[in-house]
């Protein structure tokens, strides 16, 4: 039992924040959220009127959280919830937090619409141009009217007209399209516009008359933490709307292996996670169409990139085999499907293209990054790092391409950090520590001013991933932390903001006089574990390639776009390289998805590229653990970082004292 718990206490874990604690039996979910500092909205005073506090309780085993949730963990729906359901509708898996009472250990997911400070999904579309040669194109065709003397079906005459006028033979017309064919022909006066997928010969939609409106497509980056999508005009590749949401599968586990475990341990777990992610993706598609002022039926194609576990769960495939050697994919090649098979309500016969996966732990998202960045065209040894809960790395030299994945976990995204949170307004995202005064200044999402500048009036709510990376690196640069990651005492560092915390010390990053945001020793250890996994993966690829250094490092992914290269190198997340050759590619996976959506040639290229990439499996590589241990030091126990210059030579004892100079 957690410290301070009593027999009447129950453990409550909230996702996606990861906050947890024990509350007394009979506490409402809303009160539990407030007690634990969780963002659960409510504006009606807990009367069950506003619905802002809707939440989704989990059920089953959650080994990641050390939790088993029984069917009676929450009280049954009461009269207030029943009334709300009758009047406004309440989804079967939703509860009103102000009415649901905690009766046992429980996991509660707070959906984006119920969060006071919603996460900022920072995956904007790239402004890079794409070639417009889409797989799905529109054809206008005049169809002969029916004739009693030469009876034939409308479909047969449509096929004949398409073959005659456009050379399109052997087309497949899905039932969803066929059901609307006769109405379209008659409303259009026997002239219709037909959307055809050139790759599969499938008709995606039929509209009456000669249609002028452009066909639309959806480029999707389906990550384990966030889902980002771009609604594109297929005629020129222009992005009409972009958006993102949290992946609702977070409630089943923040990292991929937790979701694999959930599928293995809970009957129906795969279907549950599949339904959650399909529902979120479909809702996001609807939001983007509404934002662009276009109809869902205008969307005729989608290109989707994702890691192997998300790939399997989107397809409804049990991911259990990905949790054990040899990590076999059910299918690694590109998949061409009907969008409706993935739960997407778009054009009746809309298509979906899933980019190929590289191997069991390196997915289509890494393939999309390789497509977008074309590192194989460079004349330098290039390391591409897609930073996330499951980092994926690609190393390219003149001899070929190597790829691996590293299980960094969610610490880089603010999870498992004492004051950590997802990226949302109020989260500290930038940190600078004066090496002389040892005092920190911060900048938060939603406010351009630094904390020591006029105009800084933001309410600081916590620290997100880019903030904790900069905080730990700045502590090392300021001499508040030694190479082992140990935080020094106030006496050893000369900094009053280094305060005792149990047997170790913590650093006060920010305070408003009533609340402190601290960086604790446990926080530093979490970042060390994450960065060590990332660096070890890079070193493993370098070993395989027979190189001791890289010429260029590209940080990909939405999170990579917000990481400072110098802080990443100080921390030892990436190998040493010239700082002017360490840069961000932004959401490269999303751009790769957009390329595959708008250009058939890009699909051919990525499928050929994947066949050339050699996979290195970190889970069974003998030297991975060796590299991991050496990378625990900040920046590294033995690898040189000449481009950084000297770091403070400090060493603190087990209690953070000392401060003796260490010879180099």
Language model features: what each stretch is:
Residues 248-290, 416-417, 425-433, 526-529, ...:
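N-terminal phosphate-binding loop and adjacent alpha-helix
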């Amino acid at each position: 039992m957690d410290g301070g718990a009593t027999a009447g206490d129950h453990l409550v874990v909230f996702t996606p924040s990861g906050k947890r604690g024990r509350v007394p039996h009979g506490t409402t979910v809303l009160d539990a959220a407030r007690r634990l500092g969780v963002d659960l909205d409510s504006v009606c005073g807990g009367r069950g009127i506003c619905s802002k506090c809707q939440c989704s309780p989990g059920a089953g085993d959650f080994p990641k959280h050390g939790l088993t949730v029984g069917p009676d963990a929450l009280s049954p729906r009461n009269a207030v919830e029943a009334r709300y359901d009758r009047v406004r509708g309440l989804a079967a898996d939703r509860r009103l937090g102000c009415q649901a009472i905690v009766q046992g250990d429980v996991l509660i997911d707070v959906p984006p619409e119920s969060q006071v400070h919603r996460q900022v999904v920072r995956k904007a579309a790239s402004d890079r141009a794409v070639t417009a040669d889409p797989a799905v194109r529109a054809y206008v065709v005049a169809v002969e009217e029916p004739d009693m003397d030469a009876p034939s079906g409308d479909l047969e005459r449509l096929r004949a007209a398409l073959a005659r006028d456009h050379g399109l033979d052997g087309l497949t017309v899905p039932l969803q399209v066929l059901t609307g064919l006769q109405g379209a022909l008659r409303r259009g006066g026997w002239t219709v516009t037909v959307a055809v997928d050139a790759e599969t010969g499938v008709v995606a939609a039929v509209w009456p008359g000669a249609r002028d409106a452009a066909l639309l497509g959806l480029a999707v980056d389906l990550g384990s933490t966030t889902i980002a999508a771009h609604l594109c005009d297929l005629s020129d590749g222009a992005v009409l709307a972009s958006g993102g949401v949290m992946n609702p599968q977070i409630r089943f586990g923040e990292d991929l292996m937790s979701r694999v475990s959930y599928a293995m341990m809970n009957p129906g777990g795969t279907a549950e996670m599949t339904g959650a992610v399909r529902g979120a993706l479909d809702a996001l598609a609807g939001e983007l169409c509404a934002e662009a002022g276009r109809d869902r039926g205008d969307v005729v194609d989608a290109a989707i990139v994702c890691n192997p576990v998300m790939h399997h769960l989107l397809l409804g495939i049990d991911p259990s085999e990905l949790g054990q050697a040899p990590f076999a994919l059910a299918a690694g090649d590109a998949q061409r499907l009907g969008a409706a098979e993935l739960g997407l309500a778009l054009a009746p016969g809309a298509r979906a293209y899933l980019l190929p996966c590289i191997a069991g732990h390196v997915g289509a998202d890494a393939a999309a990054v390789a497509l977008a960045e074309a590192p194989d065209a460079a004349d330098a040894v290039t390391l591409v790092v897609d930073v996330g809960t499951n980092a994926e790395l690609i190393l390219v030299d003149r001899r070929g391409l190597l790829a691996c994945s590293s299980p960094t976990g969610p610490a880089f995204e603010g999870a498992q950090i004492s004051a950590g949170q997802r990226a949302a307004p109020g989260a500290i995202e930038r940190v600078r520590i004066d090496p002389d005064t040892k005092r920190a200044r911060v900048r938060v999402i939603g406010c351009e001013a630094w904390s020591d500048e006029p105009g800084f009036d933001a309410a600081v709510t916590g620290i997100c991933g880019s903030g904790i990376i900069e905080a730990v690196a700045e502590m090392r640069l300021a001499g508040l932390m030694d190479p082992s990651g140990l935080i020094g005492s106030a006496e050893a560092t000369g900094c009053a903001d280094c305060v005792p915390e149990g047997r170790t010390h913590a650093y006060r990053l920010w305070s408003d006089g009533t609340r402190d945001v601290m960086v604790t020793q446990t926080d530093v250890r979490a970042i060390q574990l994450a960065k060590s996994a990332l660096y070890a993966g890079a070193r493993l690829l370098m070993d395989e390639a027979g190189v001791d250094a890289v010429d260029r490092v590209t940080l990909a992914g939405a999170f990579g776009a917000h990481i400072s290269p110098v802080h990443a190198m100080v921390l030892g997340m990436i190998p040493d390289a010239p700082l002017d050759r360490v840069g961000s590619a932004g959401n490269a996976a999303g751009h790769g998805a957009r390329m595959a959506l708008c250009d058939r040639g890009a699909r051919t290229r990525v499928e050929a590229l994947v066949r050339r990439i050699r996979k290195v499996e970190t889970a069974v590589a003998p030297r991975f653990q060796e590299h991991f241990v050496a990378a625990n030091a900040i920046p590294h126990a033995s690898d040189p970082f000449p481009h950084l210059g000297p770091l403070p030579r400090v060493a603190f004892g087990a209690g953070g004292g000392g401060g003796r100079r260490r010879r180099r």
